[in-house]
């Protein structure tokens, strides 16, 4: 296949920038060696990236004999990105630099998830608050990434269907961008991504997926979802719906799911499902510590209440956790048998519950095929509750690496 000069130049810029980003401090000769480019080409591209202000000099190489070569590094701490996670009950947002270092983060509850206008208004207020608190120059913010559960139109910035929010065909990026423009007088690039895939991006760039070419990130929270990274790229699917692990059927005649199907994994093993099952047990007269730990108010029973009771060896709570872990383990074992990944990363709130994770690991070991997944590593994420927001913010870093450099507005170029 013939490649035109423009495409070849872009490919080479991507290669050099990615090498500098991955390696940290590196000299031009080493860049040429690692990329396979000629030294003159490596020098030319590095100088262009210096002019683009995304690469900078970081001194001379230590320990080198003779004239010590100049070293270069990714200037990730000079630019920032905003990420926001539209979780079903709370908005989590952060401002971070392109090295993944948060400079401000906060969260706000969502009182009425069904009210899209109110949720978007709250999101704009939260982002504006964080930008003000961070004190960073706004012209150094490259854009805003948004993670939302459900089926999305990424090009149009719309939520086609989000069962957790009960949204259908909701415009998201346009009104959010307009509200931010009113508050900050800046129109930033806005990127939309499914929350599971955003979470996987966070793991790929800054978490347990660093250095892995093929891994799966599984979201164990209010809902259940998954996303795969293969050869460094997100697996999206033909219609953008890949990774809906929570909507595989595990009980033919199981409870109704928010998606409209019956017996989905999310309907029997998610945080929301565990809490509802506990309320049903209490209402049926089962004796359990769960209600006491919820302050005697059945409406305050949450998944975390059930896990707290399970840690106290409450029989009913232990049974709920065991049952959820068994279903999730079956789902993960099926993923391993189908896809044979290098690593599986368990993320979000329930991934911190050792009783649940222990049950999942036990079931996965039993249910996976004997020769499938022999090398797969099952690990818990270290990104914490802001993992999806980190991944949403990382969309700007991914875009920068794909473009082979910064793409600044005229106002940004004049201000930098």
Across the structure, where does each feature detected by a protein language model lie?
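ATP-binding/phosphotransfer module of carbohydrate and carboxylate kinases, centering on a glycine-rich
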Residues: 1-60, 64-140, 181-185, 252-253, ...
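Phosphate-binding/catalytic loop of phosphoryl-transfer enzymes
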Residues: 84, 142-147, 151-276, 391, ...
């Amino acid at each position: 296949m013939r490649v035109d000069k423009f495409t070849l130049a872009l490919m080479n810029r991507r290669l050099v920038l990615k090498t500098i980003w991955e390696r940290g401090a590196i000299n031009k000769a080493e860049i040429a060696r690692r990329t396979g480019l000629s030294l003159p080409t490596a020098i030319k591209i590095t100088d262009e990236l210096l002019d683009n202000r995304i690469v900078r000099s970081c001194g001379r190489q230590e320990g080198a004999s003779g004239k010590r070569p100049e070293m270069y590094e990714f200037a990730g701490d000079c630019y920032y990105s905003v990420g926001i996670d539209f979780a079903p009950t709370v908005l989590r947002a952060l401002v971070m630099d392109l090295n993944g270092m948060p400079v401000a983060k906060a969260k706000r509850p969502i009182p009425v998830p069904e009210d899209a206008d109110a949720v978007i208004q709250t999101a704009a207020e939260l982002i504006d608050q964080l930008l003000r608190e961070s004190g960073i120059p706004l012209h150094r913010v490259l854009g805003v990434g948004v993670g939302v559960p459900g089926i999305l139109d990424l090009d149009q910035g719309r939520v086609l269907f989000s069962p957790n929010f009960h949204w259908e065909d909701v415009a998201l990026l346009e009104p959010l961008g307009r509200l931010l423009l009113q508050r900050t007088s800046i129109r930033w690039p806005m990127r939309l991504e499914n929350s599971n895939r955003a979470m996987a991006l966070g793991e790929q760039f800054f978490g347990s997926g660093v250095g892995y070419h093929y891994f799966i990130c599984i979201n164990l929270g209010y809902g259940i979802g998954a996303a795969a990274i293969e050869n460094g790229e997100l697996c999206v699917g033909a219609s953008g719906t890949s990774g809906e692990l929570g909507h595989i059927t595990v009980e033919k005649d199981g409870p109704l799911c928010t998606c409209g199907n019956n017996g989905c994994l999310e309907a029997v093993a998610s945080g929301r499902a565990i809490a509802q099952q506990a309320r049903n047990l209490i209402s049926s007269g089962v004796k359990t510590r769960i209600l006491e730990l919820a302050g005697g108010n059945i409406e305050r029973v949450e998944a975390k209440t059930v896990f707290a009771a399970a840690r106290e060896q409450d029989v009913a709570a232990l049974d709920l956790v065991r049952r959820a872990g068994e279903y999730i383990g079956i789902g993960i074992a099926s993923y391993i048998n189908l896809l044979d990944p290098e690593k599986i990363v368990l993320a979000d709130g329930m991934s911190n519950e050792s009783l649940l994770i222990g049950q999942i690991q036990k079931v996965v070991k039993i249910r996976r095929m004997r020769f499938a997944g022999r090398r797969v590593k099952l690990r818990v994420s270290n990104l914490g509750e802001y993992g999806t927001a980190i991944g949403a913010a990382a969309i700007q870093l991914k875009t920068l690496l794909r473009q082979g450099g910064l793409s600044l507005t005229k106002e940004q170029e004049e201000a930098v």
